[in-house]
Amino acid sequence: MAITKVHARQIFDSRGNPTVEVEVTTDKGLFRAAVPSGASTGVHEALELRDGIKADYVGKGVLKAVENVNKTIAPALVAANLDVKNQKAVDDFLLKLDGTPNKSKLGANAILGVSLAVARAGAADKGVPLYQHLGELAGNKGPWILPVPSMNVLNGGSHAGNKLAMQEFMILPTGAKSFTEALKMGSEVYHALKSVIKAKYGQDACNVGDEGGFAPNIQDNKEGLELLNEAIAKAGYTGKVKIGMDVASSEFYKDGKYDLDFKNPNSDPSKWISGEELGQFYKEITSEYPIVSIEDPYDQDDFESWSKFRADMQDKIQIVGDDLTVTNPKRIAMAIEKKACNGLLLKVNQIGTVSESIQAALDAFNDGWGVMVSHRSGETEDTFIADLVVGLKSGQIKTGAPCRSERLAKYNQLLRIEEELGANATYAGENFRRPF
């Protein structure tokens, strides 16, 4: 089935910033997709095209990207008469049309919107659910796997105004028997955490950040881990709910050192620590707390520290590359060669097409890595990644706290998928790193 029309518009994301929405029309109907956007971005990511006009939307307008879809991509794609079921042919066509290594001509946000909408059209043309179509594109077939949600419930770093250097503290309900039960556990721990925070720091500490997590005035990282332990115990899930962290350490890497006081403009350089010292801290906390996954423990180009830490930990925990790998096959190949990590954070907008995202996951799986499909901090109500994580059978998704509708949209879609699959649904649980 060929495409008869492509149309883009500017809409708003969960932070009130403009983003791109694309509609692709075929004889089967109209298929829509919206593009997310990150706050802490890796320098190696594909280019998100913004207008940069300070007087309009604080420089964050995307009307140029929208125009690139409507005036360049749309007529070319309709004329090409490609079959929407052949995702790779469509994506290759888009890449050729752009012609740059980082999608800077048309914008990764323009290209991705089209790519996502085409995938939806392809599923409809085949008459199958989106997760099944995406799974088949990845060479998978059922039974399908429901992911462990990695819920960001405590915020620091660039996502919060407190002193916390590390960006996200997450809960993973690995001890649940189903995704439905996992969401119940996550929700109950989240509410227990809220009451613990309210008692310790007061009502105003219960405001939520971009991804629905709390950002109380925590002074150091261990204090955050203690809060999580307390909330997990209070909800009655000790042993069943584990902890994950996104350190986002590229945000506080300065002159070859790590500044855990980076939010203080008068931070003392003599207190900045080496990668080796930071590694000691990670070893300490992984022995004291039920931590199963650490994302971006080091700067995106500090390969030496990554490789040493992975060798030291001997795969006891998942070490996830995000800024390190940016869902880019070349960066993933480099990380595989240097044995830098054993997990990939998969963000479709870091690379910019569905086909390249699937290839990134396959490359990671081939080296025995785990793959965690992820949202961005600036999200929309689009639920594409919920279907993607099921189709890839990757067993883990990171899409925020059980709070804020743009986060719950993904979790609710996973509830629907689990219900639809019935007895054919398998929850990844404790096997979330290698579920199949």
Curated annotation (Swiss-Prot):
Gene3D superfamilies: Enolase-like C-terminal domain (3.20.20.120), Enolase-like, N-terminal domain (3.30.390.10). The active site is at E211 (proton donor), K347 (proton acceptor). Pfam families: Enolase_C (PF00113), Enolase_N (PF03952). GO terms for cellular component: phosphopyruvate hydratase complex. It is found in: Cytoplasm. Mg(2+) is required for catalysis and for stabilizing the dimer. Mg(2+) binds at D246, E295, D322. Its EC number is 4.2.1.11. This is Enolase.
